[in-house]
Amino acid sequence: MNNKVVGAAGEDLACRYLEKNGYKILERNKHYSRFCEIDIIAKFKDTVVFVEVKTRKTNSFGAPFEAITKSKYDNIRLGVQYYLSENKVKKYRIDVVGITLKPELKIEHL
């Protein structure tokens, strides 16, 4: 499984997890520039939630959350600012869903 396939599988799992927990998925893979993408935009109650999904096959090279660098976080924030400039949003937050596929499926939501 290449990284693109792993990432897409992780995003699918994250969407199912979020929906199961009361989130409504508004958009997926929203691109604002070559460097600026929001994996999932969802709504939970009255809050718009911007979700970054990090998926790893195993934890051999570290946990999924360790893949979020300052640069990546800055790009996520930039995407959020673009979205907010185009949409009326009163409440929002940024979440991260970390997924490890093996040895057993593990989904963590921060």
How should these model regions be labeled?
Residues 12, 55-103:
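Catalytic cores of nucleic-acid endonucleases
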Residues 1-28:
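Acidic-basic catalytic patches of nuclease active cores, encompassing PD-(D/E)XK
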Residues 33-36, 103:
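Short acidic/glycine-enriched loop/turn segments that link adjacent beta-strands
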Residues 28-32, 97-100:
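Short, solvent-exposed loop/turn elements at beta->coil junctions and helix N-caps
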Residues 110:
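Hydrophobic residues at beta-strand termini and immediately following loops
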Residues 38-59, 76:
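Conserved catalytic cores of phosphodiester-cleaving nucleases, focusing on short active-site segments
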